[in-house]
Amino acid sequence: MISTKKIDQFENHIGYSFKNKKLIISALIHPSFLVDKKKTKFKLPNDFERLEFLGDRVLGLAISSIIYKKFDNNNEGDLSKKLSYLVQKNFLHKISINLKINNILKYSSKKNEKM
């Protein structure tokens, strides 16, 4: 599904090597890809949604910590607005293109059209 070469290229680009390759593969293959490609014989555990859930929380916490420290004169409302902007779908999509995640992520072509 995702070649070792592509994972290696991605790791080199972001400067991080994933210890658990199965986990990164699970995180990069959206279930819609399997349905779209009619690869129903290929079963992935439901890790994608679980990893998405966890990743959303980790990302929110990490960004909250950064803006809390950086904008020490801002009130809670201003910090919340900054956080909301930084974790919104459109902003994260731009980041994913910059990180070249789109070169390795597998998802339905129908899902791609919505982005």
List PLM regions with ranges.
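RNase III-family endoribonuclease catalytic core
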Residues: 2-115
